[in-house]
Amino acid sequence: MKLILASQNKHKAQEMQAILGDKIELVTLDAAGCGDIEIIEDGDTFEANAIKKAVTVMRATGLPSIADDSGLCVDALGGAPGVYTARFAGEGASDDQNISKLLNALDGVETAKRTARFVCVIAVAYPDREPVTFRGECEGYILTEKRGENGFGYDPVFFVEKFGKSMAELPAEVKNSISHRSCALAKLSIEE
């Protein structure tokens, strides 16, 4: 089955396709002829943003679409950055700028209180029915400095206790088997 991926994020597309394998073929917005589509993520929840993206692309193409909205929720920050994860340090901020702001916000917070989770909501929108969502989470805590070279986003400061490593220190196949995105995609049931 083919699904139009409602994202221009190449890292996200590669990770999702690696997790899905041959089960589902993700078609990029460019390949679907709507690479110039712009979707404002203004929802208050991951679910609202994922649904908005999937439905917008489904309406533009007339084809089943899949979207992901994900982020980092840090308990000591009241769940922030949450839906603002990608722009925590401001619109257009780099991963390093976002990480720097996060580490500054947690300066002086003891390890036991640096608990966090990556959250991912996958939405699938079909032309003939209501969209469906699937949620996945990955628990961990925030380190005081970056570790590792793999992954993207906040992976270098997100520690996974089970492995004793940051997400960025894990090989891609291990990360993809435990990540929030993997947990959400594992729940995905496609209706043809």
Which residues fall in each region the model found?
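Anionic-ligand binding patches
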Residues: 2-4, 10-29, 33-192
